[in-house]
């Protein structure tokens, strides 16, 4: 009966127009104009609720096939597919707005337009404003709310998290032994293997104390592909190296079966013509990255972009991660076999110290489920290769269902920049965490964290399990023995919630609060001494140089093997991609220190910049604000001063966004406040811009040219009056160099003049 009812609802929906569906969804009933008047009198039906869902289900099957579809059922039918319909309508409305000069009045609503007062914001926006601030404030404190859950992706986290409990003994390191086929190869590699050299390195207490107080020794090198590298270390004499012209797989000490499977897994990057093809099974970029990874130094690579080399980088760090896990587990299993065959004497246990305080040894932090899916697929491919015998992957179907996506879900008419399409591909839910256990040629997905070798999670997924001070349910012991931390696409976390990343780093490699059944006779001494952070390798990948990302790398990465950072400087800048003829006025503000920059920028803006735009002649002014907290401060100030403005942020409802864009285009609102996070997640083209103010330089340099090029969307002969003003300080050196180039940025920061003019688009 339930199937018949759903068919009836779907048939009913198929006969309704889009306007009827919208009215039904908004008001819970159809418009009276479309009422179907039945000539027969319908008797009222009295329904009694059953005590259990089972009895109600059995009774419903005995009912007749014909039933009266009430307005309530029609509403439920629309709500069932509301997300899909809203997405389709949203994209269609966007396309219409991109093609037309004005927004369709029916999308805005005549009654809402007539009731809009010139000096006040839209009522719907006002009701959402109180929750906006509360939601965003709660992100940093409680990690709850809308962080990262932008309109493109809604969290799919269920109340009950699934974990695999069936295969515990099969993947246990305590009860399994090394297979004969891989046992011999392991012992042959121990002497020169960089893995063994790293974990067997013994630090002294004096070295730890000296490293805490002494500055790091640095040395700069230039590599053919990576470019300018900075080697640094606090623990040992500076050792640098240059990549050889070609490398042999055997010299890399890859664990079986990676020597044979890597070539096939990486073949997609080697099949093309030109210099990418190499006999070493690595691309030139992968070769240099893996040489640094395999030396167990920390690495910061800020040129990983989803559009250009994202998959290339993902392949090489997955190879390093699974190589590390296979070696670590092979050592444990080999020692299990040795302990079983020989009798232990007094003090012999020190020869078998091969574990940490907890089993998880690799943590991979990625922003979306799609990235986690690709990482697991790479692990399967690296273990399987050309082998005719398929490896065992438990819960694979469930994993693909929860982390995969339906290609038909994305509207075909969606037009966005290529970099947007590359980032927001597949399942973009940002709340997830999954444990992966690997034992020789078998993979266990959804393994309990304390039975896992590799943890794959988003910052939000980790934040909700780590918890905060005072919370009853919190757990971070699984982070105590992480030996390899991979943070991929770090720039996206700036658009989600960077506080989650800082919270994670503050809980890395702490002593566990519980033993979790560990055999202390097998735990390495440096782990017992709470020195795990000095043995942890951190690989940090992002698309840009940013002060917050640099701070994490400099503060939290203290690997005894040293650090390597790629420090290439942009020579041209994104301002060269501005196509419109536009004067760019860069105004430098002064601040005593980094802590006072926020207040200095605000007072400089309201005292020096804003008075120039209060005149009605300077209408159609867009103010681009990268920080949400600056946005809230400006919004409150504009309200206090009763300025004629509207605003769009990442929490504004879709209807509010449409109205704000319409009012700004028509000139009914003089100012439009726009957050960078909204632009990152939506990439709307804001029409009607004549004056542009960058309250702060954008995080992504290419956003500068994108926003500037929006001025040509509604060109009506006002090109001569267009203006662009940019605020910057000496603390914005990296962002300034990314926009104007490193040479111009140096001149602008050192010049006694505080105002600099650039003109683009000249013929």
From Swiss-Prot:
GO terms for biological process: embryonic organ development; maturation of SSU-rRNA from tricistronic rRNA transcript (SSU-rRNA, 5.8S rRNA, LSU-rRNA); positive regulation of embryonic development; protein catabolic process; protein destabilization; protein localization to nucleolus. It comes from Rattus norvegicus. Residues 643-704 are annotated as: Represses p53/TP53 degradation. InterPro entries: P-loop_NTPase, UTP25, UTP25_C, UTP25_NTPase-like. The modification Phosphoserine is found at residues 10, 52, 60, 64. Residues 84-119 have a biased composition (Acidic residues). Residues 1-190, 580-642 are annotated as: Promotes p53/TP53 degradation. Residues 1-164 are annotated as: Disordered. Residues 25-43, 54-70 have a biased composition (Basic and acidic residues). Keywords: Developmental protein, Nucleus, Phosphoprotein. It is found in: Nucleus, Nucleolus. Phosphorylated. Phosphorylation is required to promote p53/TP53 degradation in the nucleolus which promotes cell cycle progression and liver development. Component of the ribosomal small subunit processome for the biogenesis of ribosomes, functions in pre-ribosomal RNA (pre-rRNA) processing. Essential for embryonic development in part through the regulation of p53 pathway. Controls the expansion growth of digestive organs and liver. Also involved in the sympathetic neuronal development. Mediates, with CAPN3, the proteasome-independent degradation of p53/TP53. Belongs to the UTP25 family. GO terms for molecular function: rRNA binding; U3 snoRNA binding. It holds the Pfam family UTP25_NTPase-like. This is U3 small nucleolar RNA-associated protein 25 homolog. GO terms for cellular component: nucleolus; small-subunit processome.
């Amino acid at each position: 009966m339930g199937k018949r009812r759903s068919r009836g609802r779907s048939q009913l929906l198929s006969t309704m127009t889009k306007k009827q569906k919208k009215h039904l969804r908004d008001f819970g009933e159809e418009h009276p104009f479309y009422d179907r008047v039945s000539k027969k009198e319908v008797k009222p039906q009295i329904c009694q609720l059953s005590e259990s869902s089972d009895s109600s289900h059995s009774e419903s099957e005995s009912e007749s096939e014909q039933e009266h579809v009430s307005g309530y059922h029609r509403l439920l039918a629309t709500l069932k597919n509301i997300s899909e319909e809203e997405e389709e309508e949203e994209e269609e409305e966007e396309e219409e707005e991109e093609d037309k000069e004005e927004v369709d009045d029916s999308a805005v609503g005549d009654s809402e337009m007539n009731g809009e007062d010139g000096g006040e914001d839209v009522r719907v926006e006002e009701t959402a404003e109180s929750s906006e601030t509360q939601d965003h404030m709660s992100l940093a404190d409680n990690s709850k709310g809308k962080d990262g859950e932008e309109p493109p992706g809604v969290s799919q986290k269920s109340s009950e998290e699934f974990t695999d409990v069936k295969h515990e003994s099969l993947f246990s390191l305590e009860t399994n032994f090394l297979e004969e086929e891989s046992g011999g190869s392991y012992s042959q590699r121990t002497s020169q293997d960089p893995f063994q050299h790293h974990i067997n390195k013994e630090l002294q207490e004096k070295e730890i104390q000296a490293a805490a107080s002494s500055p790091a020794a640095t040395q700069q090198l230039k590599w053919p592909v990576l470019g300018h590298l900075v080697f640094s270390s606090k623990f040992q004499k500076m050792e640098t190296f240059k990549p050889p012209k070609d490398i042999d797989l055997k010299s890399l000490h890859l664990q079986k079966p990676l020597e044979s499977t890597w070539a096939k897994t990486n073949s997609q990057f080697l099949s093309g013509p030109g210099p990418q093809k190499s006999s070493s099974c690595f691309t030139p970029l992968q070769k240099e990255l893996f040489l640094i990874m395999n030396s167990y130094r920390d690495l910061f690579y800020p040129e990983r972009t989803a559009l250009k080399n994202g998959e290339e980088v993902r392949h090489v760090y997955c190879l390093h991660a699974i190589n590390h896990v296979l070696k670590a587990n092979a050592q444990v299993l080999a020692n299990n076999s040795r302990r079983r065959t020989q009798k232990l004497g007094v003090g012999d246990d020190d020869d078998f110290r091969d574990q940490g305080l907890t089993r998880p040894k690799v943590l991979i932090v990625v922003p979306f489920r799609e990235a986690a899916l690709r990482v697991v697929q790479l692990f399967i491919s690296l273990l399987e290769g050309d082998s005719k015998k398929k490896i065992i992957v438990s819960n694979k179907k469930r994993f693909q269902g929860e982390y995969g996506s339906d290609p038909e879900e994305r509207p075909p008419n969606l037009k966005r920049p290529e970099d947007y399409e590359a980032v927001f591909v597949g399942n973009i839910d940002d709340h997830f965490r999954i444990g992966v256990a690997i034992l020789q040629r078998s993979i266990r997905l959804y393994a309990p964290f304390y039975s896992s070798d590799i943890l794959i999670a988003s910052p939000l997924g980790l934040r909700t399990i780590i918890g905060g001070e005072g919370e009853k349910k919190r757990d971070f012991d699984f982070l105590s023995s992480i030996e390899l931390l991979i943070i991929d696409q770090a720039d996206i976390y700036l658009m989600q919630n960077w506080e989650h990343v800082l919270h994670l780093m503050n809980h890395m490699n702490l002593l566990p609060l519980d033993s979790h059944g560990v055999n202390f006779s097998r735990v390495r001494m440096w782990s017992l001494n709470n020195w795990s952070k000095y043995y942890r390798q951190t690989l940090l990948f992002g698309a840009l140089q940013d002060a917050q990302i640099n701070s994490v790398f400099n503060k939290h990465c203290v690997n005894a093997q040293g650090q390597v950072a790629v420090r290439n400087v942009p020579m041209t800048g994104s301002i060269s991609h501005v196509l419109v003829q536009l004067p760019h006025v860069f105004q430098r503000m002064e601040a005593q220190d980094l802590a006072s920059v926020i207040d200095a920028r605000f007072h400089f803006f309201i005292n020096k910049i804003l008075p120039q735009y209060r005149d009605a002649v300077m209408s159609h002014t867009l103010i681009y604000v990268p920080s949400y907290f600056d946005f809230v401060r400006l919004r409150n100030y504009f309200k206090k001063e009763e300025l004629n403005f509207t605003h769009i942020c990442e929490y504004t409802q879709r209807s509010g966004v449409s109205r704000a864009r319409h009012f700004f285009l028509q000139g009914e609102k003089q100012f439009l406040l726009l957050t960078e996070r909204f632009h990152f997640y939506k990439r709307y083209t804001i029409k009607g811009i004549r004056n542009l103010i960058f309250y702060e330089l954008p995080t992504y340099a290419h956003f500068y040219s994108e926003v500037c090029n929006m001025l040509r969307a509604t060109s009506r002969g006002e090109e001569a009056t267009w203006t662009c003003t940019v605020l910057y300080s000496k603390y914005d050196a990296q962002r300034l160099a990314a926009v104007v180039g490193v040479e111009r940025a140096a001149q602008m920061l050192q010049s006694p003049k505080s105002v600099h003019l650039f003109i683009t688009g000249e013929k």
